[in-house]
């Protein structure tokens, strides 16, 4: 199976724009290179998000907006695999809101897997299943809240869960990109 493991960072609490997006492809158990892009969100930044991510407005000012980046770098890759993210409902909602904000049409239903749920199966004795906790447990370097680093860590977590016997297909969900909600398996 082909997985597109991704992470988003947002400039403010609205979570309808992206200031950074990172991804890597995992196919047949092999992780491809991490890709990461700053994005001009064309909106204001909240101080909280700046402190969390380190991404300031001036870093994004000359970067492409989401629509340009989507067409140039993301749409083809994201269309050819199951999306995977850590706390995926958040990232799926951000992606759906961004597509809507820019008037971009994509799939109505996108398949996804949440590695938080997968990790709970593979690592049941951990006190929590946050990205930084799992990265530490697996000995991964993590620049938390850098979308590329978070996506790469998520990909390693996906592979570690598979090694421990967790089946990603058991955690497959659908996300209605128009209604912005997770669907039960029977509705996919």
Q: What are these language model-derived features?
A:
Residues 1-110, 124-145:
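Conserved non-catalytic scaffold segment of RNase H-like nuclease domains
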Residues 62, 85, 120, 179-183, ...:
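Short, surface-exposed loop/turn motifs that are enriched in glycine and acidic residues
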Residues 68, 117, 151-153:
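Short secondary-structure boundary/hinge segments and terminal tails
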Residues 95, 118, 154-158:
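Buried hydrophobic packing segments
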Residues 111-114, 172-173:
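Beta-strand segments within the central parallel beta-sheet cores of soluble alpha/beta enzyme folds
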Residues 113-124:
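Short, flexible loop segments at boundaries between secondary-structure elements
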Residues 146-160:
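Acidic, divalent-metal-coordinating active-site segment for phosphoryl/phosphodiester hydrolysis
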Residues 157-188:
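Acidic two-metal-ion nuclease catalytic site recognized across multiple nuclease folds
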């Amino acid at each position: 199976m082909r997985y597109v493991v991704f992470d988003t960072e947002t400039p403010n609490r609205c979570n309808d724009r992206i200031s950074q997006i990172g991804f890597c492809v995992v196919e047949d158990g092999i992780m491809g290179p991490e890709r990461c892009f700053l994005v001009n969100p064309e909106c204001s930044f909240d101080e909280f998000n700046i402190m969390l991510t380190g991404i300031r407005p001036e870093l994004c000012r000359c970067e492409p907006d989401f629509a340009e980046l989507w067409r140039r770098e993301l749409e083809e890759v994201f269309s050819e695999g199951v999306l995977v993210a850590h706390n995926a409902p958040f990232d799926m909602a951000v992606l759906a809101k961004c597509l809507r904000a820019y008037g971009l049409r994509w799939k109505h239903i996108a398949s996804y897997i949440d590695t938080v749920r997968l990790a709970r199966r593979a690592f049941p004795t951990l006190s929590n299943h946050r990205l930084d906790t799992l990265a530490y447990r697996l000995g991964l370097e993590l620049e938390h809240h850098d979308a590329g680093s978070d996506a790469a860590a998520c990909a390693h977590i996906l592979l570690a869960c598979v090694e421990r016997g967790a089946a990603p297909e058991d955690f497959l969900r659908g996300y209605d990109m128009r209604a912005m909600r997770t669907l039960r398996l029977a509705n996919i």
